[in-house]
Regions:
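Short, well-ordered beta-strand segments in beta-rich or mixed alpha/beta enzyme
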Residues: 6-13, 45-77
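Glycine-rich beta-strand-turn "strand-cap" elements at beta-sheet edges
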Residues: 1-4, 40-58, 81-110
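N-terminal short leaders/motifs
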Residues: 1, 10-17
Length: 110
């Protein structure tokens, strides 16, 4: 495994009261679009905040390089099924935060 893996953490702050709608939208449209378009292989997982800041949907992606990451997002943003989903998701979000992280050269990796 490459010790220089790049992880991208995307945190979406969901409008209060809208999390059930966001989860349903991801389940019925977002995830199927990711799988059908062949985009799901980079996904480590989706998470919903339980303590600390609430109303957050967090997803983590793993890439071998920044070039691979940029190609992935470029391809995803050209996927019409995913973009139809994204257009419905955006009004339910308050803000988005993206953090890029490099894997440490020791310890377990997802």
């Amino acid at each position: 495994m490459n010790s220089l893996e790049l992880y991208e953490r995307r945190t979406y702050e969901v409008s209060v009261g809208q999390m059930p709608k966001v989860l349903e939208l991801y389940s019925s449209q977002g995830w199927p679009a990711l799988e059908a378009g062949g985009h799901s292989s980079f996904l480590v997982g989706y998470f919903v905040s339980d303590t600390g800041p609430l109303h957050q949907l967090i997803h983590i992606w793993r890439f071998t390089s920044d070039a691979e990451r940029r190609d992935f997002w470029s391809n995803l943003f050209e996927d019409s099924a995913f973009m139809t989903f994204a257009a419905q998701l955006r009004p339910l979000l308050q803000r988005q935060e993206i953090q890029l992280m490099r894997s440490a050269p020791w310890g377990p990796r997802p």
